[in-house]
Amino acid sequence: MGQKINPIGLRLGINRTWDSRWFAGKNEYGKLLHEDVKIREILHKELKQAAVARIVIERPHKKCRVTIHSARPGVVIGKKGADIDKLRKKVADITASDVVINIVEIRKPELDATLVAESIAQQLERRVAFRRAMKRAVQSAMRLGAEGIRINCSGRLGGAEIARMEWYREGRVPLHTLRADIDYGVATAFTTFGTCGVKVWIFKGEILEHDPMAQDKRMAEGDNSRPRRDAA
């Protein structure tokens, strides 16, 4: 089962928590959920070049706090904060709450599964050999301290007539171990031959304590992220 299921969903409530962190009654829940979906769609569309890994949405009293985890915070903020002001206005058009946007810089994008998957997808679109792109990503992750990494690429790889799946793994990736800190990301490459799917699993060690916020704390305390910048 651990081989098939999304490893993030499998570990929710154990060592990983949700990216939407709020509670609402049944009358409000549907409306707020649709707002979250629209906010994420707009931010991913506007920040294509900013290497955004995660968008966390919290809703304290009459506020909407959006935390953007990005490898390029300068692209998000823009010159003198101009771009982030535009983002805040676009998000404010969706929700009636006061919008606060925070930015967290990811210092080691090579250890973030979503960013690794997007990087490989972009290389496939530029016609880089898929084996070279996969091998380079694996070597970078292992060099920076990952305990294991697995990458799957599927589709008409290299322009082949018949679609197939190729994978590459180094180190351990224990998908059945619930205490394992496994990051998972997917991306799609739109090539001239059709779409190619990229999946990445990165094993960063084990989290022994039962704490849904453990992964966030590890990112904040380690080298993966710098202190957050408030852009209220």
Curated annotation (Swiss-Prot):
SUPFAM superfamilies: Prokaryotic type KH domain (KH-domain type II), Ribosomal protein S3 C-terminal domain
A GO cellular component entry from the record: cytosolic small ribosomal subunit
CDD domains: KH-II_30S_S3
Matches recorded under PROSITE patterns: KH_TYPE_2 (PS50823), RIBOSOMAL_S3 (PS00548)
Keyword Ribosomal protein attributed: yes
SMART domains the record matches: KH (SM00322)
Highest taxon of the lineage: Bacteria
Name of the protein in its database record: Small ribosomal subunit protein uS3
Domain KH type-2: start-end pairs: 39-107
GO biological process, one term: translation
Family according to the record: Belongs to the universal ribosomal protein uS3 family.
Keywords: Ribonucleoprotein, Ribosomal protein, RNA-binding, rRNA-binding
Gene that this sequence comes from: rpsC
An example Gene Ontology molecular-function term: mRNA binding
Pfam families: KH_2 (PF07650), Ribosomal_S3_C (PF00189)
Chain's role: Binds the lower part of the 30S subunit head. Binds mRNA in the 70S ribosome, positioning it for translation.
UniProt subunit comment: Part of the 30S ribosomal subunit. Forms a tight complex with proteins S10 and S14.
Keyword RNA-binding among record annotations: yes
